[in-house]
Amino acid sequence: MNNNIVNLVAAIVLSLGIIFGWQYFIVKPQQQKQQQQIALQKAKDLKKKESAQLEATPVIVQEASQAPRIKIDSNALSGSISLKGLRFDDLILKKYKQDLSENSPEVVLFSPSDTKDAYFAEIGWVSNLSSVKLPNNETIWNSDSEILTPEKPVNLFWVNEDGVKFLVAITVDENYLFTIEQTIVNNSNQELPVQSYGLINRKYTAVEKAVNILHQGPIGCIDENLKEYSYDDIKDKKSEKFSASKVDWIGITDKYWLTSLIPDKSSNYSSNFNYAVKQEVERYQVDFISPVQIVKPGENFSIKGRLFAGAKKVDLLDKYEKQYDIKLFDRAIDFGWFYIITKPVFYAMNFFYKYVGNFGISILIVTVIIKLLMFTLANKSYRSMKRMKNLQPEINRIKNLYGDDKARLNQEIMALYKKEKVNPVAGCLPILVQIPVFFSIYKVLYVTIEMRQAPFYGWIKDLSAPDPTSIFNLFGLLHFSLPSFLMIGAWPILMAITMFLQQRMSPEPADPVQAQVMKFMPLVFLVMFSSFPAGLLIYWSWNNILSIIQQYYINKLDK
């Protein structure tokens, strides 16, 4: 096969095929996606309560939101805890708005079980003996305070008719982590076989289906392995059970938000990812339950767990993972296949952001660094392409001589490459190396909360969203809306122009078919990239500009 065609397949079809694959998995109407982003990030419901037996199916319960409550107030959170059933079902993320509008409300994470977007977490005790009287979802707890703050913990208690006292101490830090210590004081004259449990319950509707570019749904680290199940996975299976396992954490993840239970590390747990339908509403639940613990008369038993409910900030998850030895906690952020590249790329962007205060500028700086690291490879690629073009007359002569003998033809061409010290695939290497970098930058822009609503300059108010302008309405001068496929903004156009100029600076492929295909690539990329995040277009445009400068410098060296 003609080696220029091999280059074409490797350098063009491969990269274009990957981009088409991305486009297939990405929700194309990006404007609608921005408007619906809140719905995708708001809490969904699920309603199931653990019964007295270990293997029993959780029961959907009904609870009024008009219950006595403890107020939550911190720099990051507001809301309340229901004293009826001890349920975390009212939580607002104070640092995040639902959209970019001036009067946008804050993001709501938790909502009570009798609301449209119900989403809550719950901890408690169950027993395999019905005679053991435990607090349940109807229990009204007593509290020593009406407000929970980072400076002021809350202590709850409830005493059953046998004199057994149940204590719960709750603290919250300055971010999104609750620490919950439960204690049983057995003042009765009988042994108490008890199990601690925790659950996260969520309502889920079909209109809020997640896109396939990242994981949304049940997630956890069980036996030091990351477990991810889509809503459809759990719906099909009805339940996914893990018996007597080491549970570091389980929860439900959204694109930017995470709710996770982190049980005490003193024992293994049985955990479940469940699905049920109640009154035509799909409900999902993740839960865990401990082994049976016997609390003898006159003895106390305590167990401590944690609840994370908030934004998936990279530095914050890293901090908790290290501080509390929570395995793979950072994997709640879906960095994808290129995790080992994507996370360092984020760290680099975040590092420069601390100094320049703009993630767009940070992207430009990181691109320069990547370009410098790849300069030697790019130089070799350019020289190889130039040699390939110079060898084209000799290759054509060999084709004329051995056109009917493919084995001899390939042998002679490879001998020519060896003699002239030319690597026929060297021209593809820079593109192949850039593919994981491209994926990584795209992932950083798409999944990290730090990039959400992060502005650049001018009309780019959100680097994680597409360029909101379009050439078809003269970039907003004509006031009418356009379908998503016509939203071809200024940055996609700049990317295509710089790509065209870069091609003009590079050696033209010797093969005429390849040369013609290359001429159309800027137009193809213009259409393909128009719905991608603006931050990615800024990266690609700047990368093209740097490539033009680099090519000019290499050309000067060759003279």
UniProtKB/Swiss-Prot annotation:
Bilayer-spanning residue ranges: 5-25, 332-352, 355-375, 429-449, 474-494, 520-540
Annotated Gene3D superfamilies: 2.70.98.90
Protein name, entry field: Membrane protein insertase YidC
Sample GO molecular function, one term: membrane insertase activity
Membrane topology value: Multi-pass membrane protein
Quaternary assembly: Interacts with the Sec translocase complex via SecD. Specifically interacts with transmembrane segments of nascent integral membrane proteins during membrane integration.
Gene Ontology terms: biological process: protein insertion into membrane; protein transport
The keyword RNA-binding is annotated on this UniProt entry: no
Subcellular location(s) per record: Cell inner membrane
Protein task: Required for the insertion and/or proper folding and/or complex formation of integral membrane proteins into the membrane. Involved in integration of membrane proteins that insert both dependently and independently of the Sec translocase complex, as well as at least some lipoproteins. Aids folding of multispanning membrane proteins.
Key words, A-Z: Cell inner membrane, Cell membrane, Chaperone, Membrane, Protein transport, Transmembrane, Transmembrane helix, Transport
Principal location: membrane
Gene Ontology CC annotation, any one: plasma membrane
Entry similarity comment: Belongs to the OXA1/ALB3/YidC family. Type 1 subfamily.
Matching NCBIfam families: PRK01318.1-4, yidC_nterm, yidC_oxa1_cterm
